[in-house]
Regions:
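Active-site beta-strand/loop architecture of penicillin-binding DD-peptidases
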Residues: 215-250, 255-262, 286-366
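Conserved active-site-proximal loop/helix segments of enzymes involved in bacterial cell-wall
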Residues: 142-164, 232-290, 363-384
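Beta-lactamase-like hydrolase cores
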Residues: 42-100, 189
Length: 384
């Protein structure tokens, strides 16, 4: 009888304790450590799996990785540049272009379909175009601080380095829609950047200003849709001092041997391009592109871009850059895409920085640079 009563009392205590949150099993902190370890292990196994957006599912499924190099043709590519780019991009969804800004020759394109056909909003990389437009139209200059709201002032160098949206929105409002489009077209936006690349598709420029103001065009790139090829051409023109080359991708050793640079046009206001360099270097040294890795002996100049594409809801991470090693320059452009908030311009800058680092490790920049053909000087071009 006493034994039965004891058993009943124990059961009552257990049930009552459970109801009031009293536990008799594994302590909470220990259970948390076990759960955390398990979650970390699971997360590590699907670290690069994209997330589903807008779909309700009872069970999360890790999607298989897509090889960004699948379908690429490596014929005629600089294999050292390609190896550096492939290793830097890894399994991330995106594209990398490596090019010679002094000739327009493409050395490697990783994920060629995205690089040739992926037209997205340029995000803050449009500030390169806006900066030159503002300088050439006399709206801004490099030294003078630009007064913004709340008595805050900022100069061009800091505005580029920190990608200040208010600064460039003000520039856009003063430029007006027609001037913004004019300078965008001068840099090659809305047209093919490459020459004789059959699969390439051009970006586009909206026929009307954004409904939320001109400032969105020059701070976030709203109204423009740009391919990685177009950004590579833009950065190449900045790097070489104002010559917009057609980008060419040789597909054989014969085409490499017979390569002749082709000029599309000379930029109007090219004399102002040197004013962009301190800000583009500052972005890498202390601004939005710090992940690229600053080096005083092998400086990188770049501009990040982070936004969500209005048409596709794709999250974007852009980085357009070039470096200087002695008398050599190399352009590296990165576009990262994702269905989730897992990409950004700073992350893209880290990919580009890894490309440069990989090439330095291969002693790439100690090799003789390919010489530009004199034919480039007599190619037909149009000035804006």
């Amino acid at each position: 009888m006493h034994q039965r009563l004891l058993i009943v009392l124990i059961c009552v205590v257990l049930l009552t304790g459970s109801a009031f949150g009293i536990t008799t099993g594994t302590p909470h902190k220990k259970r948390h450590r076990i759960a955390h370890a398990t979650a970390t292990a699971v997360k590590a196994s699907v670290a690069f799996a994209p997330k589903l957006i807008g779909v309700r599912t009872k069970k999360r499924v890790a999607l298989p990785l897509v090889d960004p190099t699948a379908g690429d043709s490596v014929d005629g590519e600089d294999l050292m540049a390609r190896r550096a780019a492939v290793q830097a991009l890894g399994p991330q969804s995106g594209a990398v272009i490596v090019a010679d800004p002094n000739t327009g020759r493409i050395l490697s394109v990783v994920n060629q379909k995205l690089a040739y056909q992926g037209a997205y909003e340029p995000c803050s990389t449009i500030k390169i175009v806006a900066a030159l437009a503002g300088l050439n139209e006399g709206i801004i200059n490099q030294e003078a601080a630009f007064k913004l709201k709340k008595r805050h002032s900022i100069d061009l160098t800091e505005a580029i380095a920190h990608s200040n949206n208010a600064y460039f929105a003000t520039v856009g409002e003063q430029l007006g829609y027609d001037k913004i489009v004019q300078y965008g077209q001068m840099f090659g936006l809305g047209e093919k950047a490459g020459l004789n690349i059959d699969s390439e598709q051009p970006g586009l420029i909206a026929e009307a200003p954004p409904s939320d103001g001109l400032g969105m065009m020059t701070s976030f790139g709203e109204g423009f849709y740009m391919t990685p090829m177009e950004l590579a051409a833009i950065v190449s023109a900045v790097a070489n001092g104002g010559t917009l080359y057609y980008l060419q991708h040789p597909s054989s050793q014969t085409e490499i041997d017979q390569f002749v640079p082709q000029v599309k046009r000379q930029l109007n206001g090219a004399q102002w391009l040197t004013n962009l360099k301190p800000g583009m270097m500052g972005a890498v040294e202390y601004g939005t592109a710090r992940r690229a890795g600053f080096s005083a002996t092998e400086p990188i100049f770049g501009k990040t871009g982070t936004c969500t594409d209005n048409r596709s809801a794709t999250h974007l991470g852009w980085f357009g850059s070039y470096n200087e090693v002695g008398d050599r320059k190399l352009v590296v452009v990165v576009l990262l895409t994702s269905g989730a908030h897992s990409v950004s311009g700073p992350i893209a800058s880290g990919v580009a920085g890894a490309v440069y680092k990989n090439l330095t490790g291969e002693n790439y920049f100690a090799q003789a640079a390919p010489q530009a053909s004199p034919a480039a000087l007599i190619s037909n071009h149009v000035s804006y």
